[in-house]
Design a protein with these regions (language model features):
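TPR/TPR-like (Sel1-like) alpha-helical repeat modules
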Residues: 185-188
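Structural detector for internal amphipathic alpha-helices that build alpha-solenoid repeat scaffolds
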Residues: 2-19, 27, 35-49, 54-57, ...
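HEAT/HEAT-like alpha-solenoid repeats
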Residues: 21, 65, 92, 110, ...
Length: 205
């Protein structure tokens, strides 16, 4: 690990990414400063030199901030396993993992996403899981029945989660899904009603 002014180290990491200096960026991956490690990850990604091993190590970093940055990058790649990150003790990391899995359309993660959507204590994690499940609902080889059951169930959750669920339910042809979207026209949350109205072509208040 390096010492010194963390601000200077962060600047070095950012500049390394823009200059294509892999050696400089790599030397800062283990810096004591969290922000520098994040910047070094981004720099190597920008250069195109971030290896699978680099990313795997970052996903195990002691800082949740670095783990989140690694997941943001992993959302665009398929060479690292990120399913376990759904169980991270830091809710912000778990939320980002759900986002990344949705971006990667990883159908094998459906059971874990369903569990998160139903049971996670953090509302943002539940919302991210519902958004990911909605994205996965359109993928060929996926357990659509499990996704449908979950989306119907979370229509009793907070407004921001119901909004996500309505978007997912609209992708199903099953009668219960159509009924739920229709029912959302009378939701107590105005934005939920508006989303349902936009999807159905109905004017709402």
């Amino acid at each position: 690990m390096t010492g010194g002014d963390p601000r200077a180290a962060r600047v070095r990491a950012v500049l390394a990414g823009h200059r294509g200096d892999e050696s400089e960026a790599r030397s800062l991956l283990g810096d004591a400063d969290v922000g520098t490690r994040r910047a070094a990850l981004g720099a190597l990604d920008r250069i195109g030199s971030l290896t699978t091993s680099d990313l795997q190590s970052a996903l195990k970093d002691t800082s949740g901030s670095v783990r989140r940055r690694a997941l943001e990058i992993a959302a665009k790649r398929s060479d690292v396993e990120i399913g376990e990150c759904l169980y991270d003790s830091d809710p912000a990391v778990a939320e980002t993992a759900a986002f990344a899995i949705g971006e990667r359309t990883e159908t094998t993660a459906v059971p874990s996403l369903v569990a998160m959507a139903n049971d996670h204590e953090d509302a943002l994690c539940r919302e991210s899981a519902v958004a990911a499940l909605s994205a996965l609902a359109t993928v060929g080889e996926v357990d659509r029945a499990a996704i449908l059951t979950c989306l119907l169930g979370v229509m009793n959750d907070r407004p921001q989660i119901r909004r996500r669920a309505v978007l997912g339910l609209f992708q199903f042809d099953e009668a219960e899904a159509e009924e739920a979207v229709q029912g959302a026209l009378a939701d107590k949350d105005r934005q939920v009603r508006a989303i349902a109205g936009d999807l159905l072509g109905v004017v709402t208040d």
